[in-house]
Amino acid sequence: MARVKLPLSAAGRVHDMGGQPGGPVPIDPQGEPVFAQNWQARALAVTVAAGGLGKWTLDESRHARERLPAEDYMAYGYYEKWMAGLATLLVEHGLVTMDELRSGQVAADGAQGVGQYDPVPPTAAQVRAALARGGPSRRPDRTPPRFASGQKVQVLSPDSAARQPGGHTRLPAYAAHQTGVIISHHGSHVLPDSNAHGLGENPEHLYGVCFYANDLWPEQVGSKDEVCLDLWESYLVAVDA
């Protein structure tokens, strides 16, 4: 696969929630298999199983993939990113060593790595039940919401909103500095920008914000389409009436 050079943000971010410009976006054919190759199913299974150890959050696992070197991020397929991110997390959290990863063998002393955990994998029924429960991010409100339905707000840039330089955020770059209207309030939810870096959940109010498509992409002149995004409170500033 050819490696594509892309302009990065000021903080060096290659990953963006809204993707990168330059389309067109390919449409997946109808009826294609869930996994193009058998190893991809195993990649999903081992990632879910490792997540069950409770050593990292969903946000942290996403950021582990995002911080791959830019060349690797653009060259790897979807599940290759998953496996590279998982390897990073396993080493960083002391579950395996680099030597264990390279050899595929548990260290003889068993002092570090997977040897300290129960080797019995969860059953299919247990996995099914865990996935059905999910991991709800809703938390009790700690403060009143800053914005109300119908209010105009402006969106910060991803680099301004992120809690760490080049860090994790769920704010797409195409919405930066754009003005939208609050259409819904979802209550307080875990802030991914904080949670991905081990800085705590720091729940914030989450809003549905609506934009005109031709404001986001001027080439869509005359379009009556609207784009609605769920955005955390710290991504937004009020627009004076």
Per-region residue spans from a language model:
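Short, basic/aromatic beta-hairpin or loop at an interaction surface
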Residues: 117-134
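Basic/aromatic-rich interaction segments and small domains that mediate binding to polyanionic partners
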Residues: 14-47, 89-90, 131, 137-149, ...
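N-terminal intrinsically disordered, low-complexity, charge/repeat-rich segments that act as generic
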Residues: 1-117
